[in-house]
Amino acid sequence: MLTIYTSGYSYSHKHCCALVIWFCEKYLPRHKIEIEVLHRGLVREGVYGWCSIQDCDWRPRSFLIEIHNRLSKEDYMKTIFHEMQHILQHIRGDLRDKRGIRCWKGIDCSDLEYSQQEWEIEANQRELDLYEEYLTENS
């Protein structure tokens, strides 16, 4: 079961939900998860979006995606898929936060630069694949 909440401004609720539902039905069909997508200006932060756990670090099931509200349609879709990939990584247990330490597949990766973080490398690679897959299936 999937529960989606959306909020913020300058976004399409219908489009946002369609992307999240598509991903969850395809890649997380048997998981009970709750996802809140908050649309807001992220200019000062210098990011398109990010994902955080809302409940516990062990077997998380509640997530918050914050996404920049002034992205092009293509960048918006890719960013949603990028952040959904992080949710998948958390649910699989590949990506974990333990007492302030970020672990990838059980290895402490807290000191790695952004470009060296395996979970970001994977999400960056997958966002384009997911974007193209979604367009192919929904055109």
For every predicted segment, state its role.
Residues 78-90:
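Active-site recognition of the HExxH zinc-binding catalytic motif
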Residues 27-31, 94-96, 134-139:
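Surface-exposed helix-capping loop/turn segments at secondary-structure junctions
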